[in-house]
Amino acid sequence: MNKDLVIYFSVYGTAKMTAEEIAKQTGADLMEIIPEVPYDSSRDHYNALARLAKKEHDEGRRPAIKNELPIKDYDRIFIGYPMWWYTFPMIIYTLFDQYDFSGKTIIPFNTHMGSEDGGTYDTIRELEPGATVFPGLPIEMQSAERGPEKAVHEWLGKLGI
């Protein structure tokens, strides 16, 4: 039997809601990717967050991860994140820089406002050539906010999970 983990990064909570639903439907353990320096989660400051995300991306920053993630203890790992500037947040690059996913199965999922996965699933395949990367779930942010249950159930069914 596979030992499953759902890890996610979320500022506004939509990736978190989706992660929680995946963990619920699969029985996987659940862990948040916590940045060393927290992002402002106030929706009133969305534009400031967008500018910061763009700056991190343009400068190739790798924000530090505060918590230890027990990647080595799991066989199958769901990785979730929001889309920022048509890609994943730079802290996800930090995740792939810090942890070895060789021999693991990675199942990505993301929330978005129209950009689908933005090619991030292919980027994960490039960053982690020793891992098996399953087809991901891009879920529109408003759909996630209304409840990701159906989308998650259908996606997991297509994956045979």
Regions found by a protein language model. Give the residues of each.
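Residue-level recognition of beta-strand->loop/alpha-helix junctions
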Residues: 32-34, 110, 137-138
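Short, conserved loop/helix-junction motifs that constitute active-site signature segments
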Residues: 71-72, 97-103, 126-129
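Glycine-rich phosphate/pyrophosphate-binding loop and the adjoining helix
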Residues: 132-161
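Short beta-alpha junction loops
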Residues: 110-115, 141
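N-terminal beta1-alpha1-beta2 submodule of the flavodoxin-like/Rossmannoid cofactor-binding fold
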Residues: 1-79, 86-88, 93, 97, ...
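Structural beta-sheet core signal
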Residues: 6, 79, 108-110, 135
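Glycine-rich, charge-decorated loop segments at or immediately adjacent to ligand/cofactor-binding or catalytic sites
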Residues: 114-127
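Short, charged, surface-exposed secondary-structure boundary motifs
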Residues: 39-43, 118, 143-146
